Amino acid sequence: MTIDAALAEQIRRTPKAELHVHIEGTLEPELIFRLAQRNQVALPYPSVDALRAAYAFTDLQSFLDIYYAGASVLLTEEDFFDMTMDYVKRAVADNVRHAEIFFDPQTHTARGVPIGVVIDGIADALAQARTEYDFSSSLILCFLRHLSEEDAFATLEAALPYRDRFVGVGLDSSEKGNPPEKFARVFARARELGLHLVAHAGEEGPAQYVADALDILKAERIDHGVRAIDDAALVERLARERVALTVCPLSNVKLKVYPDLRDHPLKRMLDAGVAITLHSDDPAYFGGYMNANWEATFDALPLDAADAHKLARNSFEAAFLPAMQKAEFLAEVDHFWSAPPKSPPATAPAA
């Protein structure tokens, strides 16, 4: 399939919420090299092009190895601020109106970077973005699931002095061998603290991990969740309970979860009534921010304008926003899709 020009223009322009993006995964090779020079960090790649060429991932772990190496250049509040502002500018260009951004403090505290440096650098950039770009956002602190639950507890406690700067906790990193129940107690503690709960599940792990994230961790949203398609009863449950899945199609193909975007179950799950939302995950590494993910997905799958309206609506409905602000965003989406589509810009004739 090839998306028609009018629909392509609409999906580029529609208001969107981004609910699945790792701020460290927005670190472009050019910025990695700039920060490495600023901080005198030696990189194992001689050039930007050599680093980009290394982005030939075979699975989640091969990606994570490079992801953590890239993050090694982040040392100061200024570094985290600059990375975050770079993401915001790209998101605004893609008509992202609200973002709920993951950050991985353990990736940085393990290198001796204080957690306050991480949180303040990111949050200060988002505060400036709210004023400068009218960009709404919040932060979600993610635990690295390949580390222990004790380490997660220590991270949560260390973050509590900054409690007003993040709204929830999540769970990411290597899914294989690290089931949701490994983090049951720390999620229970986060729930007691009034934090929102999300978890990566059913990306490389089985459909059962999705159910366990809901039942054991009490996750309010599932990040990825595509393996739920293997369990018809689970798909029915997700639809019935309006559990949102934050799906990242380009990531799923890049990490070999699916061999081709045409094999992706997004459309089947959307048609089954699941609250699917569409996001970029780690866009610097997977070759696409929000609009690139939307366009590639609409190119590959039999999706139409009604699906695009639904995906945009789902993204705001699933967001952790105050009711009034959520209603305003939903009205903005509905108004956009009720208007007749504008013609795409004319292409100048060849000379």
UniProtKB/Swiss-Prot annotation:
<feature type="binding site">
    <location>
        <position position="20"/>
    </location>
    <ligand>
        <name>Zn(2+)</name>
    </ligand>
</feature>
<dbReference type="InterPro" id="IPR032466">
    <property type="entry name" value="Metal_Hydrolase"/>
</dbReference>
<dbReference type="GO" id="GO:0005829">
    <property type="term" value="C:cytosol"/>
</dbReference>
<dbReference type="GO" id="GO:0008270">
    <property type="term" value="F:zinc ion binding"/>
</dbReference>
<keyword id="KW-0479">Metal-binding</keyword>
<keyword id="KW-0862">Zinc</keyword>
<dbReference type="GO" id="GO:0043103">
    <property type="term" value="P:hypoxanthine salvage"/>
</dbReference>
<comment type="similarity">
    <text>Belongs to the metallo-dependent hydrolases superfamily. Adenosine and AMP deaminases family. Adenine deaminase type 2 subfamily.</text>
</comment>
<dbReference type="GO" id="GO:0000034">
    <property type="term" value="F:adenine deaminase activity"/>
</dbReference>
<dbReference type="GO" id="GO:0009117">
    <property type="term" value="P:nucleotide metabolic process"/>
</dbReference>
<comment type="function">
    <text>Catalyzes the hydrolytic deamination of adenine to hypoxanthine. Plays an important role in the purine salvage pathway and in nitrogen catabolism.</text>
</comment>
<dbReference type="InterPro" id="IPR006330">
    <property type="entry name" value="Ado/ade_deaminase"/>
</dbReference>
<protein>
    <recommendedName>
        <fullName>Adenine deaminase</fullName>
        <ecNumber>3.5.4.2</ecNumber>
    </recommendedName>
</protein>
<feature type="binding site">
    <location>
        <position position="281"/>
    </location>
    <ligand>
        <name>Zn(2+)</name>
    </ligand>
</feature>
<feature type="site" description="Important for catalytic activity">
    <location>
        <position position="224"/>
    </location>
</feature>
<feature type="active site" description="Proton donor">
    <location>
        <position position="203"/>
    </location>
</feature>
<feature type="binding site">
    <location>
        <position position="22"/>
    </location>
    <ligand>
        <name>Zn(2+)</name>
    </ligand>
</feature>
<dbReference type="InterPro" id="IPR028892">
    <property type="entry name" value="ADE"/>
</dbReference>
<feature type="binding site">
    <location>
        <position position="200"/>
    </location>
    <ligand>
        <name>Zn(2+)</name>
    </ligand>
</feature>
<dbReference type="Pfam" id="PF00962">
    <property type="entry name" value="A_deaminase"/>
</dbReference>
<feature type="binding site">
    <location>
        <position position="282"/>
    </location>
    <ligand>
        <name>substrate</name>
    </ligand>
</feature>
<keyword id="KW-0378">Hydrolase</keyword>
<dbReference type="InterPro" id="IPR001365">
    <property type="entry name" value="A_deaminase_dom"/>
</dbReference>
<dbReference type="GO" id="GO:0006146">
    <property type="term" value="P:adenine catabolic process"/>
</dbReference>
<keyword id="KW-0546">Nucleotide metabolism</keyword>
